Each structure stands twice: as structure tokens, then as C-alpha cells.
Design a protein with these regions (language model features):
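Catalytic cysteine-centered active loop of the rhodanese-like fold, especially the PTP/DSP P-loop
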Residues: 70, 75-118
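Short active-site oxyanion
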Residues: 38-44, 59-60, 80
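Short, structured coil segments at secondary-structure junctions
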Residues: 57-59, 103
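Flexible, polar/low-complexity N-terminal or interdomain linker segments that lie immediately upstream
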Residues: 1-43, 50-52, 126-144
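Conserved beta-strand scaffold positions in the cores of enzyme catalytic domains, especially
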Residues: 44, 61-63, 107-109
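Glycine-rich, highly charged phosphate/nucleotide-binding loops
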Residues: 62-70
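Residue-level "edge-of-site" marker
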Residues: 48, 66, 113, 130
Length: 144
């Protein structure tokens, strides 16, 4: 049985892990820069519950709580979908990324979730401005 200590002494596995981590995660400052640069190949996805989304979210983010993951309307197969949840520890965003990637959507995870976004004192939008309407098959309109 391989223990945690054995794994950390395997430089090849560590290299592969951190290369993947860098490829599939972004930080709050980098995401904020992308949003402000009017990045048109980006969809920001908040997977928290609707009431938490309405209290505040990353500007331009769509809301896609867990109950809607089977039919992930608003995601794009042609853009990078940056997914976030409450905190780094909740793993909701990571689980969403696994499901969305399995359905063919390119994904990244925002490290630290919305809590870290707030700690950096970055812009926050309130209300349900970008929440998708139930039963609506169209993709969310992205305007940064």
C-alpha cells in the first residue's frame, strides 16, 4: 500500500500533478484580469445555491447549482468555463468540473472559490442578472 509519504517522494508524479493543476486552475487576480480584458472565450460559472449567488457573485457569472448539472445550460464547448463554489475546501467546483469535463466542456477551477475572491476585494455583482431561466435551452449571453 502506498502512503502519502511514498507519493511525495515520487518526483515524476509530483511533476505531472502540478502541471495538471496549473493547466486546470486559475486564481482570483488572473480571472479578474481576464474579465476586465473582455475575454470573449470565457464563461464564469457559479455552482453555489441560487440564494447565495443572488447575494453576490463574480461579475458576469452564470448560476448553475448542483441540481442543474445533468443539463448544464449556459456552458460552452467553444470557450473555457471557469467554475467556482464557496471555498477551496467545499470541492463543489471540483466535482462540477469532473462532471462538465465528462460531458465535453472545457473547464478550469477558480482556486479558493468565492470566499477568496472576496478576500482579494475584487468586484462583486449582486442579484440574479445572469441566472439562466428554467426551461430555457439557449446559452447564456456573455457580455464582459
Amino acid at each position: 500500500m502506498q502512503t502519502t509519504m511514498n507519493r511525495i517522494h515520487d518526483p515524476a508524479k509530483a511533476k505531472a500533478y502540478f502541471e495538471d493543476k496549473l493547466a486546470f486552475t486559475t486564481g482570483p487576480v488572473e480571472l479578474d484580469r481576464w474579465i476586465k480584458a473582455h475575454e470573449d472565450n470565457l464563461v464564469v460559472v457559479d455552482v453555489r445555491e441560487e440564494e447565495d449567488y443572488e447575494k453576490g457573485h463574480v461579475p458576469g457569472a452564470i448560476n448553475l447549482p448542483k441540481k442543474q448539472w445533468d443539463n448544464p445550460r449556459g456552458l460552452s464547448r467553444d470557450k473555457t468555463n471557469v467554475v467556482y463554489c464557496y471555498t477551496q475546501q467545499c470541492h463543489l467546483a471540483a466535482n462540477a468540473c469532473v462532471q462538465f469535463a465528462a460531458k465535453g466542456f472545457p473547464v478550469m477551477e477558480l482556486e479558493g472559490g468565492f470566499e477568496t475572491w472576496k478576500e482579494y476585494e475584487l468586484d462583486i455583482e449582486e442579484g440574479a442578472t445572469n441566472r439562466l431561466k428554467k426551461g430555457s435551452p439557449q446559452l447564456a449571453e456573455r457580455r464582459y
